[in-house]
C-alpha cells in the first residue's frame, strides 16, 4: 500500500496509466480504507457521472483539500448546497451571455497581442504566465464587472501557490494542522489573503457602482440572499477554477501549435477570414465564434491530450458494478480523463496531435461514446462554465495566432499534474510577428 501511494505521489499520470495498461478498465488499488477503484471505459464513466450520479458524492480527499481554498463553492459542494447555488448561478452562463464574454476576451486578447507586438522578432516569453493573466482578466470583467488590472499577475501567482498546497495536502493528508506555521501553511495563508483581498475589492466596487447592466454573476449572488461566506466561496471558486481551466487549455494549445506550425498557419488564416480586422467594428457574436471551426478543433484536441481536470473522484453511496467487478458503497472511484481520452476503443492514434479528428466526429459521435471526451466532466455536475470557457479559449487562440507565430524555445515542457495539468517549467516560446 505504501509503495503504491509513493508511486502515485511521484508521478501520478505514469502510475495511473501503468495500472490501466496492466490491469485494464477496472483497477482496484491496494488501499483498504476506503476501497479504491479506477474506472476508465467510457461506458463505466457514463455510469458514474451520468446514469448513477445520484449514488455518488464529492466527499473525497481531493475535494476536501480544494475546499481549503474555495470553501463550499459550486466545484466542491454536494446537495443541497450545490443544487441551490447552481440554480442561482445558472442564468449567468446562459448562451445570451456569451457575446459579453467574447467582448471581454477580445479586449484582453488585444492587450496581450499589443504586448507581444511591441517585442522584437525572436523575443522569448513565458506564454503560460501571459495567458494566465489574460484568463483572470476575462473572468474578472465578465462575471464580476471588475477590472483586475495590475493585480491580475499577483492573483495568478496566489492561485498557483494555493493550488500547489492543495495538491500537497491531497497527496500527503497527514500534514500539520493549518494553524501551525509550517512553510506550506504560511504559503497557503498568504495566498488566501491575496484571494480574499480580491473578493473585498470586487464587493466594494460593486457596492459603490451599483448593479451591472445586464446583470452578471456577482449581481445574482448578491441578490440571492446567500451569506457573505457563501458569496466569498463562489467568487473565489470562479476566480480560481474559472481562469485556471482556460489558461491550461490555451497554454497547451499554443505549445502544441508551436510544434505543428502548419496547423498554426491554418488557425491564423481562419482567424484572418472570420474575425473583424483592425479597422472594423469589433462585434463578435455566436455565429462568428461558430465559424472558427479549426480553432475550436485545436482547443478540443489540446484538452484531449492535456485535459485541464486530469482527475475526477467520487465516493459511492450505493453498491455498483463495473465490468463484472463489485464496488461496495463507501468506495472511492477514480476517473482520469488523461486515460479516458486515450482509450483505444474510441481514439485512433491517441498520442498524436490531430485536431481534424474533432471535425470528423471521432470520439464524440454518439451518445454511447460522449463520455470518452470529458474535459469539463459529464452529467449533472458538468462544469457550469463550459460554453464560457470555449468562447474565451477559441477567441483568444484565434486572436493570438493571427498576430504572431510562437515556436518552442528552451527545453521541452512536460505535463505536471497539479489541480490542473500544468507545464513543469516556464513555457518559453519565441515570438515572430506575422
Label each PLM-derived region with a short phrase.
Residues 335-364:
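Conserved cytochrome P450 K-helix/beta-meander segment immediately N-terminal to the heme-binding cysteine loop
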Residues 1, 57-63, 81-83, 97-248, ...:
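Cytochrome P450 heme-thiolate monooxygenase catalytic core
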Amino acid at each position: 500500500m505504501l509503495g503504491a501511494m509513493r508511486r502515485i505521489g511521484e508521478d501520478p499520470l505514469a502510475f495511473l496509466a501503468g495500472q490501466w495498461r496492466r490491469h485494464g478498465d477496472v483497477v482496484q488499488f491496494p488501499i483498504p480504507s476506503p476501497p479504491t477503484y479506477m474506472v476508465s471505459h467510457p461506458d463505466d464513466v457514463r455510469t458514474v457521472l451520468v446514469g448513477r450520479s445520484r449514488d455518488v458524492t464529492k466527499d473525497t480527499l481531493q475535494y476536501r483539500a480544494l475546499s481549503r481554498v474555495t470553501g463550499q463553492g459550486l466545484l466542491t459542494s454536494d446537495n443541497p448546497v450545490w443544487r441551490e447555488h447552481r440554480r442561482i448561478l445558472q442564468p449567468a452562463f446562459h448562451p445570451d451571455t456569451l457575446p459579453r464574454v467574447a467582448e471581454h476576451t477580445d479586449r484582453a486578447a488585444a492587450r496581450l497581442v499589443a504586448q507581444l507586438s511591441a517585442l522584437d522578432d525572436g523575443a522569448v516569453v513565458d506564454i503560460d504566465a501571459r495567458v494566465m493573466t489574460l484568463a483572470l482578466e476575462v473572468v474578472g470583467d465578465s462575471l464580476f464587472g471588475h477590472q483586475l488590472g495590475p493585480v491580475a499577475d499577483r492573483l495568478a501567482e496566489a492561485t498557483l501557490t494555493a493550488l500547489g498546497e492543495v495538491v500537497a495536502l491531497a497527496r500527503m493528508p497527514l500534514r500539520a494542522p493549518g494553524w501551525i506555521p509550517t512553510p506550506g501553511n504560511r504559503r497557503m495563508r498568504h495566498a488566501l489573503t491575496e484571494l480574499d483581498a480580491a473578493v473585498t475589492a470586487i464587493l466594494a466596487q460593486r457596492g459603490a457602482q451599483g448593479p451591472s447592466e445586464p446583470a452578471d454573476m456577482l449581481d445574482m449572488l448578491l441578490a440571492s440572499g446567500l451569506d457573505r461566506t457563501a458569496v466569498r466561496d463562489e467568487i473565489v471558486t470562479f476566480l480560481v477554477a474559472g481562469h485556471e481551466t482556460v489558461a491550461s487549455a490555451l497554454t497547451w494549445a499554443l505549445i502544441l501549435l508551436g510544434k505543428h506550425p502548419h496547423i498554426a498557419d491554418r488557425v491564423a488564416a481562419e482567424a484572418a477570414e472570420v474575425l473583424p480586422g483592425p479597422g472594423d467594428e469589433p462585434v463578435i457574436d455566436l455565429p462568428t465564434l461558430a465559424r472558427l471551426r479549426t480553432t475550436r478543433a485545436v482547443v478540443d484536441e489540446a484538452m484531449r491530450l492535456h485535459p485541464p481536470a486530469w482527475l475526477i473522484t467520487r465516493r459511492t453511496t450505493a453498491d455498483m458494478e463495473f465490468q463484472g467487478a463489485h464496488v461496495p458503497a463507501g468506495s472511492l472511484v477514480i476517473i482520469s480523463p488523461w486515460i479516458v481520452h486515450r482509450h483505444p476503443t474510441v481514439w485512433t492514434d491517441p498520442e498524436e496531435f490531430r485536431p481534424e479528428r474533432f471535425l470528423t466526429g471521432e470520439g464524440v459521435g454518439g451518445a454511447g461514446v460522449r463520455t470518452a471526451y470529458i474535459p469539463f466532466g459529464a452529467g449533472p455536475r458538468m462544469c457550469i462554465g463550459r460554453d464560457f470557457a470555449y468562447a474565451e479559449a477559441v477567441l483568444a487562440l484565434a486572436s493570438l495566432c493571427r498576430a504572431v507565430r510562437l515556436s518552442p524555445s528552451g527545453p521541452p515542457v512536460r505535463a505536471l499534474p497539479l489541480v490542473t495539468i500544468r507545464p513543469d517549467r516556464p513555457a518559453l516560446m519565441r515570438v515572430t510577428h506575422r
